[in-house]
Regions:
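Surface-exposed strand-loop-strand hairpins of Gram-negative outer-membrane beta-barrel proteins
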Residues: 67-92, 103-117
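Outer-envelope beta-barrel architecture signal
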Residues: 54-60, 91, 100-102, 131-135, ...
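Short loop/turn motifs that connect adjacent beta-strands in outer-membrane beta-barrel proteins
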Residues: 31, 35-39, 43-56, 184-205, ...
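Transmembrane beta-strands of outer-membrane beta-barrel pores
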Residues: 64-70, 99-103, 108-112, 130-132, ...
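Extracellular/periplasm-exposed beta-strand and loop segments of Gram-negative cell-envelope proteins
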Residues: 84-92, 146-152, 161-174, 218-230, ...
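Outer-membrane beta-barrel translocator domains and adjoining extracellular loop/strand segments
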Residues: 71-79, 116-121, 148-154, 190-194, ...
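Residues on the lipid-exposed face of transmembrane beta-strands in outer-membrane beta-barrel proteins
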Residues: 62, 93-99, 124-128, 177-183, ...
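Outer-membrane beta-barrel "beta-signal"
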Residues: 176-179, 341-365
């Protein structure tokens, strides 16, 4: 199986383009085009007492990416049941190359290096980390690659033999975009923790607020699940009526608020922790693409969340570290619920080179 990941990371485009003005006297600028520079400066203005801007134009990085995905399907009521699924962990490795705000990478699945095998998974992640704004775009599709991690079929049914069984009746496709605004952008740097394009020099925190959109599609073969249950448990188990569906689609619009903190615990070292909670309104759709419930319903509100954690050593030229992004989405109806947790864990080491004009003769931190 081949696992190819294309990562487009727009590393602080606004800050990188205007970084020179943060630590040197601004040169006279002609009126022509000066409005663009003022706009860029407005979006990337940071206090260099707190944040050291990028010194280089080019970057080279090696990164390992471990992907985690967990799904829990459950029903409610006196005959409530639950099944938890997750695929085998993916570990991918590859090089990345960047110029200022463009970062491109190519990774392969270390579990199977046969480049001619087709993977049942496809993942695309893109992130923008700028001084004032941030954005995430992600698409994930997993087809028949899940294993049962736990199951509850009733008080008198021992489901231990189901644990670890491969299940080829679950297909999941999820597409989403998140946009957020960083309030204390002059003193706090998200790129320092997750894009390695600046350095946080003094510990600092900030509140954030954002908007998000999510489109989720779940295909579930309940007949295959009943057959697998009989095969592994040696008895026929009837799935609850809430599980007897073939497809569920829902769209989610959310508003989020969160807090992030950059802790500079030693010279050139940084630890970042960020948590955001979102209130999302989800509208589900039936298999014939018609809305199940076209009217407003308070029960369609759910709580979602996203966490970002990172530790990095960066002296502006060399850097190394690890980061994790975890997302949690919840969908609840009167008889059925789906909970999804997925994320990436990254370990990387890299080099910046090609000093920018103002830093060609400057020593690193």
């Amino acid at each position: 199986m081949r696992k190819v990941v294309f990562l487009l990371m727009l590393m602080t485009s606004l800050m990188a383009m205007a970084g020179d003005s943060l630590s040197v006297e601004p040169a006279p600028v002609s009126k022509k085009g000066s409005w663009l520079k003022r706009v860029i400066d407005a979006f990337s203005d940071q206090d260099t007492l707190y944040v050291e801007p990028q010194h280089y134009n080019w970057a080279l990085m090696l990164q390992s990416v471990t992907t985690y995905d967990y799904y829990r399907l459950s029903t409610t009521g006196p005959n409530g049941q639950s099944i938890s699924f997750s695929p085998q962990l993916d570990v991918r490795f590859g090089p990345y190359f960047g110029w200022r705000w463009v970062f491109l990478g190519y990774t392969v699945d270390l579990r199977n290096l046969n480049i001619f095998n087709k993977s049942p998974k496809f993942e695309l992640d893109a992130s923008i980390y700028s001084a004032r704004f941030g954005a995430d775009l992600f698409f994930r599709r997993t087809v028949n690659d899940y294993k049962i991690r736990s199951a509850y079929m009733g008080p008198d049914i021992n489901t231990r033999n189901l644990e670890g069984a491969a299940f080829d009746g679950l297909k999941v496709s999820i597409t989403g975009v998140n946009l957020y605004y960083i309030f204390n952008y002059r003193h706090f740097s998200y790129p320092a923790a997750f894009a390695q394009s600046s350095c946080q020099k003094i510990s600092c925190g900030t509140w954030m607020a954002g908007l998000g959109y999510l489109n989720n599609h779940i295909d579930f073969d309940y007949e295959r699940m009943e057959a697998l249950t009989k095969e592994h448990l040696g008895q026929e188990v009837k799935l609850d009526s809430g599980f007897r569906f073939n497809s569920v689609k829902y769209r989610n619009i959310s508003a989020s608020v969160g807090y992030a903190y950059n802790w500079v615990f030693a010279r050139n070292w940084l630890f970042c922790s960020s948590l955001s909670m979102a209130i999302g309104y989800k509208k589900s759709y039936s298999e014939d693409e018609k809305s199940i419930n076209s009217g407003f319903d308070f029960s369609n509100f759910n709580i979602d969340g996203i966490g970002r954690f990172g530790i990095v050593w960066n002296n502006t030229k060399w850097y190394a570290g690890a980061s994790a992004i975890v997302r949690a989405y919840n969908y609840h109806k009167s008889r059925f619920a789906a909970n999804n947790i997925f994320g990436d864990f990254n370990i990387y080491v890299g080099l910046n080179f090609g000093p920018r004009g103002p830093y060609k003769k400057k020593r690193t931190l």
